[in-house]
Amino acid sequence: MITELRSIWKEAFGDSDVFMEDFFSVAYSKDRCRTLRRDGKTVSALYWFPVFEGGAKMAYLYGVSTLQEYRGQGLAAYLIEKTCKELQAKGYSGVLLVPGSEQLFEYYRKLGFFACTAIAEKCISAAGCIQLRPIEREEYAVLRRKMLPYRGVEQEGAFLELLERQYKLFAGDGVLLCAAVQDEQAFIPEFLGDKALLPAVAGALGVRTAQVRLPGQGRSFSMYRPLDGHRPPLYFGLAMD
């Protein structure tokens, strides 16, 4: 089963073996995975993480994928619809996902999703330095809850285990971030706190430039499908995309 799921994932997304090993060792659960079989094999799959906004439990759908030779038959759409009904019966208030392209935004609109959050993306040049301290995911979760923007989505548990495998987690005076550093550039998929400190944060990471995702107006990022009428969130930051 896992071998089949890894094959589907690799063909659909091209992620590294290291990432797939991390995902299937710390984030995967058969209870949060749904599949379709055809011709004696698994051909389509999706996964989800439980997330929360305003006390409401939601699902972040992740890794929706179908083998190339079985695409165009509506399998993923069927699997999503079936999963949404199951999640609704389990008491989930809504479903979130992050499309990887404009074409996928259109695809998911046809399945009842609508764009609900946006992010701003900036390239920051290092200037100055502030003190950052590495932290573990448990502290990161506590601080993140306090610093999330209004109606932001809490993402914890297995998702943060996977995040910690892929990124370093840091806290400083008034800032919280996760970052991956390669050569002289950093990628910061989420930064919470005083944006004026970003140049000094880049300096603290020891890089010349940092690509940063920020809460705010920018490109559409996540989509939402309500299951019980609950309001859509206004911020969704960590996609692991």
Feature annotation, model-predicted:
Residues 66, 72-85, 110, 193-206:
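Conserved acetyl-CoA-binding loop-helix of GNAT-fold acetyltransferases
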Residues 111-189:
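Amide-forming acyltransferase catalytic core, primarily the GNAT-like/NAT-type
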Residues 87-100, 207-216:
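Conserved GNAT acetyl-CoA-binding A-motif
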Residues 9-53, 145-169:
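Active-site rim helix/loop that mediates acceptor-substrate recognition in acyltransferases
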